[in-house]
């Protein structure tokens, strides 16, 4: 288990992270960064800066992670907004992210996401900025509606 200090730190190395077991998310983790987010008072667009920062932190060329710009995640009252998802994993939507602290937290979160069952990073292992900025956690598409338990 990762302690909180290591969960709040990130390393920008370019070594691909391999999922350790079959319940880890398959396919790439997709990090979608809203590029139309503005400051709360609407005076400045902060999305492009967040996108550039997240892309730099997570690296380019890692087949396990894709960072993409999106025009709107419809969480306009909580800029900057970022979604993290994978084909068979949970989707997380975070808001209220500042470029520096949010980027470091997201880099650490994505590494943990890749190693967690279905991308479900335990709450206590998430950086405080992500715990406070949580907008939504959506279960994987293969979620069982009959019993509500995690996919098997």
Model segments located where?
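Short flanking/linker segments adjacent to small metal-binding domains or redox-active Cys/His motifs
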Residues: 78, 83-89, 107-152
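Polybasic, low-complexity association/targeting segments
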Residues: 3-37, 146-152
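Ferredoxin-type iron-sulfur electron-transfer modules in oxidoreductases and energy-metabolism complexes
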Residues: 47-65, 96-101, 106-109
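Intrinsically disordered, low-complexity regulatory segments enriched in Ser/Thr/Pro
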Residues: 91-95
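Generic structural "secondary-structure junction" signal
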Residues: 75, 96-99, 132
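Short, charged low-complexity linear segments at domain edges
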Residues: 2-18, 42-61
């Amino acid at each position: 288990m990762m302690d909180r200090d290591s969960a709040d730190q990130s390393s920008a190395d370019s070594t691909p992270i391999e999922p350790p077991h079959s319940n880890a998310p398959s396919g790439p983790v997709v990090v979608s960064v809203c590029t139309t987010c503005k400051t709360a008072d609407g005076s400045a667009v902060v999305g492009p800066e967040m996108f550039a920062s997240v892309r730099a932190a997570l690296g380019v060329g890692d087949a396990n992670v894709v960072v993409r710009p999106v025009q709107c995640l419809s969480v306009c009252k909580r800029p900057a907004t970022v979604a993290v998802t994978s084909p068979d994993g949970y989707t997380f939507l975070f808001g209220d992210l500042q470029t520096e602290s949010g980027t470091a937290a997201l880099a650490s979160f994505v590494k943990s996401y890749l190693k967690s069952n279905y991308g479900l990073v335990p709450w206590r292992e998430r950086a405080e900025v992500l715990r406070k900025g949580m907008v939504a956690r959506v279960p994987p598409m293969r979620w069982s509606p009959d019993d509500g338990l995690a996919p098997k």
